[in-house]
């Protein structure tokens, strides 16, 4: 069965303490036809290097580093970049069950 592409949009701002667990849980989804759009919203901590490390390991990740403009503007940019038939928003302190996207 053909799986439609799901775009997972993750705005990030100063989330270094939660980010590895969050992105790791997104990458581990049992539903594999996903694009992961990570938008670093001008973080001043080590969030960007954490995101870059995940991008280097997973080609499904699109990483955008931008000036801080707030979460609403950042989510809207993610929507503009999304190519999926469906969209999921995830916050940087979320941890997803492996079947989260499959249940969509």
What are these regions (language model features)?
Residues 1-104:
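Nucleotide-sugar donor-binding/catalytic module of glycosyltransferases
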């Amino acid at each position: 069965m053909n799986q439609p592409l799901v775009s997972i949009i993750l705005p990030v701002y100063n989330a270094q303490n939660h980010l590895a667990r969050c992105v790791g849980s997104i990458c581990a989804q049992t539903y594999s036809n996903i694009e992961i759009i990570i938008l670093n919203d001008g973080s001043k901590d080590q969030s960007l290097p954490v995101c870059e490390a995940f991008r280097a390991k997973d080609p499904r990740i699109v990483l955008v580093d931008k000036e801080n403009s707030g979460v609403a503007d950042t989510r809207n940019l993610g929507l503009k970049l999304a190519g999926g038939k469906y969209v999921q928003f995830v916050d940087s302190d979320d941890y997803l069950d492996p079947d989260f996207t499959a249940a969509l």
